[in-house]
């Protein structure tokens, strides 16, 4: 099972007695969604699910569930990844000229955040109709809720390569004003609760390590919508995600 860690005082059971003998059960949990197995013995089976992306670095499915959180992607008839979220485990911190860029390798000497061995890759595309949501959280009833807390983001090697050396499609290196931007939008009952923008590449500057993004301003959510935009046409719209934190509250009355 892919890791969904419980942080802090993970579960609190509250029983309150009233005049009518009513009570409620309340579970308050900090969830950490890490895109790798819980246990070492599961690693080999996990690795065997990887394919595509060069050197067996990618695993994809129309829906990847980790705890109560679903991560969606779009596949073609041959089950090749078209867009959305997939899992990856490659790394490449070399963006020198002539390097063959990888769309799925994180631009880092290590792999995931905190040195983990896997992470997620998000790809935004208009080439295929994407799922309704990028990430959706299972909320069991009307009294329960979830709030996004944070996520760690990073660049893929192909994006850095294209920004530093150009795309090879009559597009030169990035200059002032050029960008690759990730937008994370929280929604609840299909209504926007808040938006967070992250500059992955800004002119000649770009993320060189896993970077924490605070998401508490998004408020209570039941889904996250991710979008990548660039100032350049035909730019590789990919980024990496890891260690996504949520505050999850279940209340049964």
Where are these regions (language model features)?
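Short secondary-structure capping micro-motifs at structural edges
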Residues: 131-141, 165-172
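Bacterial Sec-dependent N-terminal signal peptides
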Residues: 1-4, 11-42, 248-253
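Terminal, low-complexity interaction segments
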Residues: 176-253
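Short catalytic/ligand-binding loop motif for oxyanion handling, primarily in non-cytosolic enzymes
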Residues: 43-44, 159-161, 233-235
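N-terminal targeting leaders for non-cytosolic proteins
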Residues: 23-133, 138
